[in-house]
């Protein structure tokens, strides 16, 4: 992709996702993802309605008037985006490819985070750690992340979620709010790794999928290629039995994936590329508020 084309795409994504963050997501994000708790700020004179449990008895005794402690939320969070860059994300039969939607969702979360004074870090992963972008604040940092998502070329096309979860635990010693963005087209079970990570971090899983992964169209002979392994074959989609078998495989796989998230106490949402991700994210944020 040419540099000028990348700049145009970055700007287009910024306009859309920054607007969403400012107008729709900022308040919901703040409510859904809490800070580290309440920290002491100052003392002031007692006012009618103040909680008597907040009275600072030492200061009250010194000045012979009641004073209360004032607390403020320790807001600043570290937000980590674990972004799947494997070969299966370069697929789309509807409005856009899965990678395009993942980029927009990640950018929306990132802008929401910096508007709440949170830091953002990113890990690109396949079946290995492809790139690590340490946490920072600011618009320039977000634009750099978007540019990397648009232009990054991974070394591997395969997926192993375990690798990125183990990496997260090794580089982030303090608690983070972590989003995993992937189609979760995985061949290896990652339940144990997710359970370990979720004990330390506030984990949220966002699955992006294409409608054709859920249901095959009846269009006769079709050439299909596994984007991660390169395996290629022709299938007869006019076979009702084949289509039903394919649909059952999808449903069974989704059931197993949801069980993995539930056993790990990980909030999650699944979004198709032909759906409005704004509605799905808002629903997720509201459920957490």
PLM regions with names:
Residues 1-33, 42, 51, 170-174, ...:
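Von Willebrand factor type A / integrin I
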């Amino acid at each position: 992709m040419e540099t000028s084309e990348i700049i145009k795409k970055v700007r287009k994504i910024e306009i859309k996702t920054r607007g969403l963050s400012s107008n729709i997501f900022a308040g919901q994000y703040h409510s859904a993802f809490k800070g580290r708790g309440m920290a002491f700020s100052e003392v002031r004179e007692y006012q009618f309605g103040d909680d008597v449990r907040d009275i600072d008895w030492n200061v009250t005794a010194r000045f012979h008037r009641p004073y209360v402690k004032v607390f403020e939320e320790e807001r600043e969070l570290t937000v980590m985006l674990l972004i799947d860059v494997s070969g299966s994300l370069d697929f789309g039969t509807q409005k856009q490819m899965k990678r395009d939607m993942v980029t927009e969702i990640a950018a929306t979360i990132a802008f929401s985070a910096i508007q709440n004074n949170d830091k953002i870090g990113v890990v690109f992963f396949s079946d290995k750690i492809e790139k690590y972008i340490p946490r920072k604040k600011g618009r320039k940092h977000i634009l750099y992340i978007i540019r990397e998502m648009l232009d990054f070329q991974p070394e591997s096309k395969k997926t192993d979620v375990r690798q990125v979860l183990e990496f997260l635990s090794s580089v982030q010693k303090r608690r983070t709010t972590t989003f995993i963005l992937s189609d979760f087209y995985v061949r290896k079970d990652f339940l144990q790794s997710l359970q370990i990570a979720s004990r330390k971090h506030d984990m949220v899983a966002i699955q992006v999928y294409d409608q054709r992964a859920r249901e095959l169209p009846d269009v006769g002979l079709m050439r299909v290629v596994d984007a991660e392994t390169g395996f290629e074959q022709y299938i007869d989609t006019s076979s009702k039995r084949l289509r039903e078998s394919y649909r059952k495989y999808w449903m069974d796989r989704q059931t197993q994936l949801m069980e993995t998230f539930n056993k790990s106490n990980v909030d999650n949402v699944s979004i198709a590329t032909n759906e409005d991700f704004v509605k799905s994210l808002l629903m997720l944020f509201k459920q957490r508020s």
